[in-house]
Regions:
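Acidic, metal-ligating active-site segments
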Residues: 10-56
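Short glycine/proline- and acidic residue-enriched helix-loop micro-motifs
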Residues: 58-60
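Long, contiguous domain-sized segments
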Residues: 1, 62-89, 94-168
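Two-metal-ion RNase H-like nuclease active-site motif
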Residues: 2-10
Length: 168
């Protein structure tokens, strides 16, 4: 079973007439080698009013929005992963480890709060026996698709793998 999630965000623009922020996360769960169709999920969250501001009254940063998106991606993966007799692999765009911790101030407090929720999602994946992986590559690359193609190809056909494209 492969479960993958990717997110995007529209950061708050302090100069816009209406201040808002949007976090989107899309996910898919596929049962390789099964006739069962993939299960998809899209979750969007609109942040506005008080959600856009730190306790001091300043707008949340782009980094804080990205952190919330990362946390939401892992939360969705934990929800879609299931305990199974076959391996469950979860994939996200980007590293598994969170970077960008601040040492003090409001962003540090936000980071610690989001990190706790992020770690809870990773612990839930572990409890369900899922393998969590992050992937970093250049835009428009299809190496993950190629990896899945290799993984699903019978061993006897691997010598011809350069000509085979079962997922395209």
């Amino acid at each position: 079973i492969v479960v993958a999630a990717d997110g995007s965000q529209e950061a708050v623009d302090g100069h816009a007439e209406v201040a808002f922020c949007l976090i989107n996360v899309g996910a898919v769960r596929m049962y390789l080698g099964s006739s069962e169709p993939p299960h998809t999920l899209v979750r969007s969250r609109l942040l506005y009013d008080d959600e856009l501001y730190n306790p001091s009254g300043s707008l949340i940063s782009d980094g804080q929005v990205a952190l919330r998106r990362d946390k939401e991606e892992r939360t969705v993966l934990a929800q879609l992963a299931e305990v199974s007799d076959v391996p469950v692999i979860t994939l996200t765009d980007g590293p598994v480890e969170l970077w960008g911790a601040k040492s003090n101030g409001e962003e540090a407090a936000e980071f610690q709060e989001q990190l706790a929720a992020y770690k809870a999602a990773l612990l839930e994946l572990k409890r369900r026996g899922a393998i969590a992986a992050g992937y970093v590559d250049k835009p428009a690359a299809n190496l993950v698709v190629r990896l899945l193609e290799v993984a699903m190809t019978p061993e006897i056909e691997l010598p011809d793998m350069r000509q085979l494209r079962p997922l395209l």
